[in-house]
Amino acid sequence: MKTLKGHLSAKNLRIAIVGSCFNQAMADALVSGTQETFLKFGGSEDGLMTIRVPGAFEIPCTIKKLLSSERKFDAIVACGVLIQGETDHYNQIVNQVAAGIGALSLEFCLPITLSIVAAPSAEIAWQRSGIKGRHLGVSGMTTAIEMATLFTQI
């Protein structure tokens, strides 16, 4: 019986990060940790492209534009920080971004990981951005690397 499994080696991989700028300090920390993780697992600076967009809502459209271009990637990591406010706007954005990214992953049959921090407060958003605690960018990049290496075996 054969079992296929990805591994944590970014050597020779081409990965894109599409990160929002809104909630800038947290978003910058999220993107930075994502970039560092790619390099930590053997990826090269030439194998990594980072694209920054104004907000999380712009991430799915930017990913689609990227995937429709001549450039080829093994995986994409979507990074953004959304903090719940007093209106329903937060829920609308979170749902649209997640649905859009999921649809693109299926449409293009490409690993696109969701490193979108969706938090009820700035304190929790900081915890998920890597300043204190779990870093969603790190987990998103490690998942992207594992999935990209798995897809080369299928």
UniProtKB/Swiss-Prot annotation:
EC main class here is: transferase
Binding of 5-amino-6-(D-ribitylamino)uracil, residues: 22, 56-58, 81-83, 114
* Superkingdom of source: Bacteria
Q: In which pathway does it act?
A: Cofactor biosynthesis; riboflavin biosynthesis; riboflavin from 2-hydroxy-3-oxobutyl phosphate and 5-amino-6-(D-ribitylamino)uracil: step 1/2
Q: Does the keyword Nuclease apply?
A: no
Catalytic reaction list:
(2S)-2-hydroxy-3-oxobutyl phosphate + 5-amino-6-(D-ribitylamino)uracil = 6,7-dimethyl-8-(1-D-ribityl)lumazine + phosphate + 2 H2O + H(+)
Positions with a binding annotation for (2S)-2-hydroxy-3-oxobutyl phosphate: 86-87, 128
Gene3D superfamilies on file: Lumazine/riboflavin synthase (3.40.50.960)
- Transit peptide: is it a keyword of this entry? no
Q: What are its E.C. numbers? A: 2.5.1.78
* Active-site residues, Swiss-Prot/TrEMBL: 89 (proton donor)
One function term, GO molecular function aspect = 6,7-dimethyl-8-ribityllumazine synthase activity
Please tell me one Gene Ontology term that the record gives under cellular component. Answer: cytosol
Q: Which UniProt keywords apply?
A: Riboflavin biosynthesis, Transferase
Q: What family is it from? A: Belongs to the DMRL synthase family.
| HAMAP family per the UniProt record, alphabetical | Lumazine_synth
Function per UniProt: Catalyzes the formation of 6,7-dimethyl-8-ribityllumazine by condensation of 5-amino-6-(D-ribitylamino)uracil with 3,4-dihydroxy-2-butanone 4-phosphate. This is the penultimate step in the biosynthesis of riboflavin.
This protein is called: 6,7-dimethyl-8-ribityllumazine synthase
| Gene name as annotated | ribH
